[in-house]
């Protein structure tokens, strides 16, 4: 699923630039992605859009400035793990994501079905949340999101 998500990010500037679902499935299949992987990724993206709409409607005036402290439930800690929680806190304290985006990231990480989720996959989730909202991470955060693999070719920022 995560390979499909990264491919979509690298290929399409914004989610609305993607072809319709049927054409996208055909294109992804032709490239070599498995049907199950494609279905999971597209389902995950649909749920991301629904979660974003729900939270945006519920908290329309939420800003990037919050002085509250997020307490994680045991289930969330089990799925996220300490490195992921630390990374989310770093992003929020640096004002790179706001509290609503944080909640979307957490919800989508829980929906990924992995426990604990790797930091690399959490970074893809963060990138996809920003991408789905039409927000481009600045160069420094983009480097932070993809700094791990020294042998990989450089990723392109839109």
UniProtKB/Swiss-Prot annotation:
<comment type="similarity">
    <text>Belongs to the Smg family.</text>
</comment>
<protein>
    <recommendedName>
        <fullName>Protein Smg homolog</fullName>
    </recommendedName>
</protein>
<dbReference type="InterPro" id="IPR007456">
    <property type="entry name" value="Smg"/>
</dbReference>
<dbReference type="Pfam" id="PF04361">
    <property type="entry name" value="DUF494"/>
</dbReference>
């Amino acid at each position: 699923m995560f390979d499909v998500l990264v491919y979509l990010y690298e290929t399409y500037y914004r989610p609305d630039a993607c072809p319709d679902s049927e054409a996208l499935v055909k294109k992804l299949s032709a490239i070599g992605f498995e049907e199950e992987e494609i279905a999971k990724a597209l389902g995950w993206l649909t749920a991301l859009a629904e979660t974003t709409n729900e939270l945006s409607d519920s908290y329309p005036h939420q800003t990037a400035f919050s002085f509250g402290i997020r307490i994680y439930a045991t289930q969330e800690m089990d799925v996220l793990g300490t490195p992921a929680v630390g990374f989310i806190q770093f992003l929020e304290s640096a004002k790179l994501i706001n509290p609503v985006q944080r909640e979307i990231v957490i919800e989508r990480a829980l929906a990924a079905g992995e426990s604990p989720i790797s930091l690399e996959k959490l970074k893809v989730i963060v990138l996809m949340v920003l991408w789905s909202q039409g927000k481009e991470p600045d160069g420094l955060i983009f480097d932070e999101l993809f700094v791990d693999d020294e042998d990989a070719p450089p990723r392109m920022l839109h």
